Regions:
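C-terminal cap of thioredoxin/glutaredoxin-like
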Residues: 37, 41-143
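Structural alpha/beta surface segment adjacent to cysteine/selenocysteine redox centers
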Residues: 1-58
């Protein structure tokens, strides 16, 4: 977690005071996505924030069943119901299908943003940590 592509992420984070953890593992997020698909829609933003904090700021392994169930519980999700569907073929296939659809739309990472504006300008999609000058450039292209 502290080398490769995370190096630029950490560098950008330091500039804006992002408290990135000293990552020991880089978790597979399949179970986190299962949680997001299971939970009520009104919990989605709260759960995304909790998962991002767990991964990036606390260095937790959200691929661990107990960790993702704890996050569910702390955020008011029916943990017993979630445990019943966690890792079922149907739940895994649902996430894989959603990921395939996102990939077809050009999503390559999270978070992912789409900025649109003028009718004559094509929407611009981008993912990950983007600094202010890059955002200004993107907005200039579409607004």
């Amino acid at each position: 977690g502290s080398d490769g592509w995370t190096h630029s992420l950490r560098a950008k984070g330091r500039k804006v005071g992002a408290p990135f953890a000293d990552w020991k593992v880089w978790p597979n997020t399949l179970r986190a996505h299962q949680l997001l698909r299971f939970a009520p829609r009104e919990k989605e933003a709260q759960l995304k924030k909790a998962c991002f904090e767990a991964i990036y700021e606390l260095g937790e392994n959200v691929s661990d069943p107990e960790t993702i169930c704890r996050i569910a519980s702390e955020n008011g999700v029916d943990v017993e119901g979630f445990r019943k569907v966690l890792d079922t073929p149907a739940a895994q296939q649902d996430v894989r299908r959603a990921c395939a659809q996102a990939s077809q739309r050009g999503v390559r990472g999270v978070p992912y943003f789409v900025v649109s504006g003028r009718e004559d300008a094509r929407p611009v999609g981008f993912s990950g940590a983007v600094d202010a000058p890059q955002l200004v450039e993107i907005f200039g292209e579409v607004l």
